[in-house]
């Protein structure tokens, strides 16, 4: 709504989403159901909720889009890479508009246990200093769940339609 876009060219609009864990929680729930109740315990919804491309697919279905549809999985950098990839597609003239972001739901007992075994969690007892994602003094990760999507377009296109521009992407880099 905030974008002010009322019309989209379905073939010139991309959807690029990122995820680190996709539907790992749904898979874990289904496996538990199968293990405890047998075949009837496996959730039918797993086929729709566990696939990593479902967030991007649901956006495309909702807006009747037929342009590029990508799901990237680059761990904690998935949202960053989705937004960067979308910006590059716009800059290259491949698309006019892109929905770009990420979503994750995946705090299973197994995930928490294995992350703890690797010593990945924050070792900061002061809750006001605990979450420092871009700070050189950070001591680990803080798991969470959430989603966010930006709508990107060229600046000249946004200005021409009188859009409120909230920011500009000046560059993007990704490395192994």
What are these regions (language model features)?
Residues 103-105, 112-120:
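Fold-level recognition of mixed alpha/beta catalytic cores in primary-metabolism enzymes, strongest
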Residues 58-62, 85-89, 150-153, 157, ...:
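Alpha-helical scaffold segments in soluble metabolic enzymes
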Residues 12, 22-85, 94, 117-142:
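Conserved catalytic cysteine-centered active-site region
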Residues 126-176:
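Condensing-enzyme catalytic core mediating Claisen C-C bond formation in acyl metabolism
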Residues 19-21, 103-107, 156, 171-176:
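Glycine-rich beta-alpha junction loops
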Residues 1-2, 55, 82, 153-155:
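Short, well-ordered amphipathic alpha-helical segments that serve as non-catalytic structural scaffolds
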Residues 1-13:
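Conserved active-site "lid/cap" helical segment
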Residues 10-17, 70-74, 95-103, 164-172:
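Beta-strand segments within the central parallel beta-sheet cores of soluble alpha/beta enzyme folds
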